[in-house]
Amino acid sequence: MKLASRKTATADVTRRQRSAHSSKEALYWIGPAALVILLIFGYSVVSVLISSFRYDGDWVGLENFEIVITDPIFLTALKHNGLLLLAVPILIILAFILAVTLFETRRGMRFYRSAIFLPYILPIPVVAVVFGQIYQLNGALNIFLRSIGLEPLAQDWLGDPSIALGTMSSVIIWKEVGFGVILMLAHIISLPNETYEAARIDGAGFWRTHLSITRPAILNTIVFYGVIEAITMVSWVFNYVYVMSNGLGGPGNATMVSELYIYRAAFQNKAPELAAAAAVFLFVATLILMVAFFRIQRRSIAGTFNK
């Protein structure tokens, strides 16, 4: 018995030594590349931060920030980013519904899963160009509506300031929902079947089962997806807006977002210092938003599992 224990202990020590050796070897390979990336990223961040306090080479303190945060166009851009955040709950709900539906649809699940995920892997500029044509005044959508007798519903989807931002958000939702479906579906498939079988025996229906069992079980995945999409809406929609509005954020700044504002300040208005100040402001605002989001979701998760 003692001999067996010694052999087990020796094997554990050997395993730990091999693991430590593998970790060191991996660090040797990854370290140089990681260091280069870190230096480049750090240099870029420091350069932007310093530029935000300068103008034409002179130190101006917070003057650039004052100009930016009092610029009506920048405030409009921030408001539009905030409105795009309203798409996050829609994405979460749609992804959850599609994920549980695919989970219950055993036949053809692979095909449907691929079809739903396909938009997510398409390049954003390609998606924006295609939908830009579809949503034109004489585009495919309006042609279809007129052909089925719904001409009153035909709109200038990208030319009407009141609906242009909503139109673009529909494109973002179409592209991003597949990512959430795959994340949630992968987690659902890993859950034990015994729980679902017990729920069926108790007479629980489709939605009761998934709202009472599936939703709490995959809440961490839902939170992760929500955070990723919130970051997307705040700081990753430039390509959609630039392509679909021809780089103008129009009509009449109706689709102006913070990223496009920074781009235009830096490259069109030749004011890189103002662009740097706007970028720093956006970074800090995004960081605060993410911290608040994580805290709220942590409390939600704790409340769910303490019930």
Per-range role (PLM):
Residues M1-S22:
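Short, Lys/Arg-rich, polar N-terminal cytosolic tail immediately upstream
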Residues S22-K307:
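A structural signal for multi-pass alpha-helical bundles of membrane permease subunits
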